[in-house]
Structure formats: structure tokens, C-alpha cells
A protein has these predicted regions:
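Beta-strand C-termini and the immediately following turn/loop, strongest in propeller blades
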Residues: 59-64, 74, 116-129, 134-135, ...
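A short helix->beta-strand "capping" segment at the edge of beta-propeller domains
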Residues: 20-44, 98-105, 223-229
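Serine-hydrolase catalytic core recognition
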Residues: 247, 395, 400-715
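Hydrophobic h-region of N-terminal signal peptides that target proteins for export
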Residues: 8-18
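Beta-propeller domains
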Residues: 188-196, 201-324, 333
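Predominantly five- to eight-bladed beta-propeller fold
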Residues: 78-92, 98, 145-159, 170-228, ...
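Short loop/turn segments that connect beta-strands within beta-propeller blades
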Residues: 75-76, 136-139, 217-221, 268-271, ...
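Non-catalytic accessory segments flanking enzyme active sites
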Residues: 46-50, 55-57, 61-62, 67-70, ...
Length: 715
């Protein structure tokens, strides 16, 4: 009998020792941010692009353990000295007299007031759908300079004068009906009754404004229209025309509806329109990545991913020729500075990722074995001449770089780090990358003393068995390799960027806290995300439900094969917005792998979400692919455990998208949980939803009851 009691007590103690999702774990989870806060010294460097002491000085601040300190740096020799905050006397000024507009609102462009650069006493205003010339600010005596504007086709007053003050370039707008989303604020703060409101919100398939470039000859009071609209007929948007040097031509950009064609167009003062640059792709042109700088009247610097990666090109108007400036196995990100002469000779400073990363790396064999190949997403800075020669790497260290350049672009302050490498801040020459001075080296000893451990970078092939996926693995601080840990993936796979953190970040909001409950939390960039190759990204086309899941599953399986404590039979997933759509999609389309999902504010049917994001990746017109990718249409497939959350005032994704999923799940007789957050906007769930998410995964994947909420009080 005594032996049986001893065995029972031993078993109970063993189970208690292996418990996860305990009150202590919850307190650790809720306290990780505070635990990590303020424990990295001289690492969070903030460079201010202010030059109060002239072009030879830069300023930066950092945290030294007792507070924020500011330094001035001589960009030529690297000498620094502590100073007061150079912005201490600066006061933020708010614009007065203007109206506030929501970012989804399409302005009617009737409130412009364009000053004549050649005659400051003149300006153009909009009145009765036409343009009027105002002299000496006497609006009452304004003279009509157009007569044919009407409600169905009016002149925009958001235009530009020619430098000589004779011409005014603008657009005529044929307005389309507006689409509105209706909101109910159920529990306003200062009243009992709900508040109802509407928000302008165009959705896929909606009609759009039609825009026609036009030039008004103010001197002769005549209008010059394009002789043909063929080159910009089926438009998603036409930008306002801009004057070229000499005031004889204008340029504007045309973005085709469906985004398969993008053109930079030129119009002369006779109404002739010609194509300068054209981008075309049978799937889509990611127009938000296009970038253009008119260097002078002859040359244009242009960024395009036509080669399969984003690169820079120099367009010569005289020769009508587009010549590569950059090329190769990297992806140009941002253009920092460009200088040129009339003949197109000069240089450009830019950032890019992926250069030299032909071999994307292999999985590490253990936690302490580093990956020798550089992360292809790391950002570096380069300088190259506009003839495509003399490429100079300005940031040689294998790390992710964040640079701020001096006023004249002679030098730059660069902070580089990685998930596992603490930040180092240096001053370098912008001409050749030569190290001028090391300014700061982060001290993370306090952080390490707290028990903190960095996430691990893990690399494994995706669906094709050869293209490597890069991600991170976060373990709890009390990690015990003898235990079994469920896996939770944090997902956001929306095309247009990459999302796995690359900088040294002690507290990873989407991973660190949740891991403390007794989970292994992972995040990776799979196919459908950006900055590798266009083919890598375009898996998403008319196929957002893919979300890189074949790659994600392969990567997680590879990690679990490497680390047996990762329990591949208990995999959860969570995300917000597009990540909310993807989290639910994981349960609907891959139920054999994902067993539990938390989906917040998801765009669960792309027909319900904002036009510009969804038509970019799903195409136009709206077709059956929208239905095939819809979580609403596929709700009957649900097998795993699901928690949905939405803010009733979500002004990013129409909350009805979540309500429609709820309705479809009810009709399909599916068991699930739903959290409606009164007054909340676009959110992962705020504090309440975060706590519910913790409990949901503890119950669903750990199979244990979470501690009562009133027990979770700080010690």
C-alpha cells in the first residue's frame, strides 16, 4: 500500500513538473515586455536627420541605462560629444483650417488653391465644376477660365502651374458612385444610445473615377485635351500631370484596372500622348513598388521588377531607351540619393537585399550551430554609377543594416544587427563605405542575466524541396528539451513585403509572450511574400488561400524533425487582418496539419475588403478565384478548433467579413468561439482578446484548463 502511494505521489510530482500553461507561465507571459524593457544599453540608437550645426554634423540618441542621451558627431572624423536634445525647442505645428479625411476617402479635388509661380497675385480655385482665376485674393471677382465642367465631368483644382505662369495642368474627373460601409458603435462612452456612421470604402469590382489629363492655357483661356485616350483608357488611376523642364511637355502615370499594365506617359501642348516607360506582366505589376525620379528634362531614374527582381533603370527620353543601372541576384529596396548631370552621368545610393545570397542556407543541426550563409532578407546599402559600373558595397557586415545619411550624403550612421546579434552603430563614408568611427556597441548583459534567450534562425526547403524558407523559432525561457511542446505559428503572409523580424529585438510581440505559456512559437516568410523573386511572390496571384502553406508545413516538419520536442501533432496558428484570413484558411484548407486557429479581423472574403489591396493580388474583374479563396464560401470545411475576433469599428477590414464567416459556420453547424470587441478598431484583440487567445491555445493544444482570470494578479 505504501509503495502504491509512493508511486502515485511520484507520478503526480512528475506531471506537476511537466505542467505547462500554469499561473506562473501566465505571469511570465504577461510580464515579458517589462522583463525585457530597459535591459539593452546603447542599442536603441535613434538618428535625427537634423543639422543644426551645419552639414558636417549628425545627431543621435541612445539609452544608457539611466536615460536617453544625445550626441553630436563630426561626420569627417567621427568625434562625438554629448549634447542636449537638438529638438528640445522644436514645437510640433498642426495645420489649421483644413478638414480631416479618413485614409480610405477618395477626395473630390475641389479644394485646391494653386499659386502662380510667375505671378504670386494669381491662383486657381474650383467653383461650379470649373476652374476660376483669382487675382489679389479677391475670390468674389474670380474669372472663369473653363466653361464645360459639370457634375458628371468636372475639373480638379489640384493642379500645377507651368514655371512661366501661362499654363495650368490638371485632370478632368468623371466621378463614380461611392461605396460605403455602415458601422454601429454599440457602446459609446458618453451616451446610452448607439452611434451609426458610414465610411467611404471602395471594394473589388466597384466603379472608379475616370481621369483625363488636361492643360489650361490661362493666357488664352483655352483647354488642351489629349488627342487620344487609348493609352490610358481602362484605368485604375491616372496621376496628376507634372511639368517637365522647359514647360513644353508633361508626364503622368497610368495604372491599368487589373494592374497588368503600368505606363509613364508624356503629353505635349498639342495633346499628343506617347509612352515613355511601360511595364506589363501577365499576372500583375505591383505598382506600389514602382519608383520614379525625373533627373532632368532628358533622363528618368526608374525602379521595376520586370527582370524578376526589383532593379534600377535609366530612361533616356531623347533615345527612347531604358538601360539597366543595377542587375543581378538582389532586390533593390529604397533609393536614398541620386545625382546626375545633363548627360546622365552620376551615381545613386540605394538599399537592397539578397546580393551574394545564391545559396540560401541549410537547416542548422543544433541550437548553437550558426547558419553561415547570410539571410537573403538582410538590407545593405550600395553606391553605383548610373552607367551600371562601379558598384560599391557600403555596409559589409553580415547583418541587417539601418542607415541614416548626412545632409549632403557624404557619410551615414549605420546600426546593424540580427535576431541573435546585438546592435553595433558606426559612422561610414557614403563614397566607399570606409569606417570612420564606431559609435556604439549594445550591452545586453542585463538582458541575458534575466534569463532571456534570442529566437533561433531556422532555414529549411519549401514545397519544391530546393527553395529555402527563412524563419525563426522562439522557445520559452524555462525551456526543457525533455518536454513536448505544441507549436504555434504566427502568420501574416500578405504579398507586398516580408514579415519575419531581422533586427535585434529582445521582445518579439507576436512570439515571446505566447511562448512563455509552454509553446514553441514560429514565424517564417514563405512563398507569396516579397523580396526574393517575382515568381516566389506571384504564387499569390488569384490564389491568396495558398498563403505559402505548403512551404510552411514543410518548414515546420523540418524543424520538428531536427528538434523532437516540437510536437508536430499539435500545431496551432494565429494572425490578424490578412493573417486572420490565413489563420482560418489553415484550418479550412489544411486541417490535417493545423489543429487550432485564432483569427482576428480577417479579410475572410476578398470581395469584402478594400479595392486597392485585393485587386492587386486577386485581379480584375472579380471572378471565381475570389469564391475559391473565400473563407465564407469554404466555412463548411472547418475541422479544427477556432476562435474568431473582430472589432466592431474596424475601419481597415469591413467587420461584416467576420460576421459573414460566423453566419456560414452557424449554418454549417460548426462549433467555434467568437469575440466581438465593442468600440475596437483593427486589432489582434487588445488585452481582452490576448488573454482569450492565451486561454484558447492552452485549452486546445495543451489540453489543460487555464488559471482563473482573478488569479492572475501580480505578486
Amino acid at each position: 500500500m505504501k509503495r502504491l502511494i509512493l508511486i502515485a505521489l511520484t507520478a503526480a510530482m512528475t506531471l506537476q513538473g511537466q505542467a505547462q500553461g500554469t499561473r506562473e507561465d501566465y505571469l511570465n507571459a504577461f510580464g515579458t515586455r517589462e522583463t525585457c524593457s530597459g535591459k539593452m544599453l546603447n542599442g536603441d540608437v535613434w538618428v535625427r536627420p537634423v543639422h543644426l550645426a551645419g552639414a558636417d554634423t549628425m545627431y543621435y540618441s541612445t539609452y544608457n541605462g539611466t536615460g536617453t542621451v544625445w550626441y553630436s558627431v563630426n561626420i569627417h572624423n567621427g568625434e562625438k560629444q554629448q549634447v542636449e536634445n537638438p529638438d528640445r525647442n522644436r514645437q510640433e505645428r498642426r495645420r489649421g483650417g483644413g478638414s480631416q479625411y479618413h485614409w480610405m476617402t477618395v477626395r473630390d479635388e475641389k479644394d485646391g488653391r494653386a499659386q502662380n509661380p510667375a505671378d504670386g497675385s494669381q491662383c486657381i480655385i474650383h467653383r461650379n465644376n470649373n476652374l476660376y482665376l483669382v487675382t489679389d485674393n479677391n475670390d468674389q471677382a474670380a474669372t472663369a477660365i473653363t466653361q464645360d465642367g459639370k457634375d458628371t465631368c468636372y475639373y480638379s483644382s489640384w493642379g500645377a502651374w507651368s514655371a512661366d505662369g501661362r499654363y495650368y495642368a490638371t485632370v478632368m474627373i468623371k466621378p463614380a458612385p461611392k461605396h460605403y460601409v455602415t458601422y454601429t458603435m454599440s457602446s459609446p462612452r458618453n451616451q446610452v444610445q448607439p452611434i451609426y456612421s458610414q465610411l467611404e470604402y471602395a471594394k473589388p469590382g466597384d466603379s472608379l473615377n475616370y481621369r483625363i489629363p488636361v492643360v489650361v492655357d490661362v493666357q488664352e483661356q483655352r483647354t488642351i485635351f489629349p488627342k487620344s485616350t487609348q493609352l490610358f483608357a481602362s484605368q485604375y488611376n491616372v496621376t496628376a500631370p507634372q511639368w517637365d523642364e522647359g514647360c513644353q511637355t508633361l508626364t503622368f502615370e497610368f495604372n491599368e484596372r487589373g494592374h497588368k499594365t503600368f505606363r509613364v506617359l508624356e503629353m505635349d501642348l498639342e495633346g499628343n500622348v506617347r509612352t515613355l516607360i511601360e511595364e506589363h506582366n501577365d499576372k500583375y505589376v505591383a505598382y506600389s513598388r514602382n519608383w520614379r525620379q525625373d533627373l532632368n528634362s532628358r533622363f528618368i531614374l526608374w525602379k521595376s521588377d520586370r527582370s524578376g527582381r526589383a532593379h534600377l533603370y535609366l530612361y533616356d527620353r531623347k533615345k527612347d531607351r531604358l538601360t539597366p543601372v543595377t542587375s543581378g541576384d538582389y532586390w533593390v529596396r529604397d533609393i536614398i540619393h541620386c545625382e546626375t548631370d545633363a548627360k546622365g552621368k552620376g551615381y545613386v545610393i540605394f538599399s537592397a537585399n539578397g546580393k551574394g545570397c545564391k545559396n540560401m542556407g541549410k537547416p542548422a543541426s543544433s541550437m548553437d550551430q550558426s547558419i553561415t550563409e547570410e539571410d537573403p532578407y538582410n538590407i545593405h546599402y550600395y553606391r553605383i554609377t548610373l552607367d551600371g559600373k562601379h558598384l560599391v558595397a557600403l555596409t559589409p557586415e553580415k547583418a541587417n543594416h539601418r542607415a541614416t545619411f548626412s545632409r549632403e550624403h557624404e557619410a551615414f550612421i549605420d546600426t546593424y544587427s540580427s535576431i541573435t546579434q546585438a546592435p553595433v552603430t558606426v559612422l561610414r563614408s557614403a563614397k566607399d563605405g570606409k569606417l570612420i568611427a564606431t559609435l556604439e556597441k549594445a550591452d545586453i548583459s542585463r538582458l541575458e542575466e534575466s534569463g532571456w534567450k534570442p529566437a533561433e534562425v531556422f532555414v529549411a526547403p519549401g514545397r519544391d524541396g530546393k527553395t529555402d524558407m527563412w524563419g525563426i523559432i522562439q522557445r520559452p525561457r524555462n525551456f526543457d528539451p525533455s518536454k513536448k511542446y505544441p507549436i504555434i505559428e504566427y502568420i501574416y503572409s500578405g504579398p507586398g513585403s516580408q514579415y519575419v523580424p531581422k533586427d535585434f529585438t529582445p521582445w518579439l510581440y507576436n512570439l515571446t509572450d505566447l511562448a512563455e505559456l509552454g509553446f514553441i512559437v514560429v514565424q517564417l516568410d514563405a512563398m507569396t511574400t516579397s523580396y526574393r523573386t517575382l515568381d516566389f511572390e506571384q504564387v499569390c496571384y488569384k490564389n491568396l488561400k495558398d498563403a505559402g502553406f505548403p512551404d510552411r508545413i514543410a518548414w515546420i516538419k523540418a524543424a520538428a524533425a531536427r528538434y523532437p520536442y516540437m510536437d508536430i501533432s499539435r500545431v496551432g496558428i494565429y494572425g490578424c487582418s490578412a493573417g486572420g484570413q490565413e489563420a482560418l484558411g489553415a484550418l479550412l484548407f489544411h486541417p490535417e496539419f493545423y489543429k487550432a486557429g485564432y483569427a482576428a479581423c480577417g479579410c475572410h472574403d476578398n470581395r469584402m475588403d478594400k479595392i486597392w489591396w485585393n485587386e492587386q493580388w486577386m485581379g480584375y474583374p472579380v471572378d471565381s478565384s475570389y469564391i475559391e479563396c473565400s473563407n465564407v464560401e469554404n466555412a463548411h470545411r472547418l475541422q479544427g478548433k477556432l476562435m474568431l475576433a473582430v472589432g466592431e469599428m474596424d475601419d481597415n477590414v469591413d467587420p461584416s467579413s467576420s460576421y459573414q464567416v460566423v453566419n456560414a459556420l452557424i449554418k454549417a453547424n460548426k462549433d467555434f468561439e467568437f469575440i466581438l470587441l465593442p468600440g475596437a478598431h483593427h486589432t489582434m484583440g487588445e488585452y481582452y482578446g490576448e488573454h482569450k487567445r492565451y486561454d484558447f491555445f492552452v485549452k486546445s493544444l495543451l489540453g489543460t484548463d487555464p488559471p482563473a482570470w482573478d488569479e492572475l494578479k501580480k505578486k
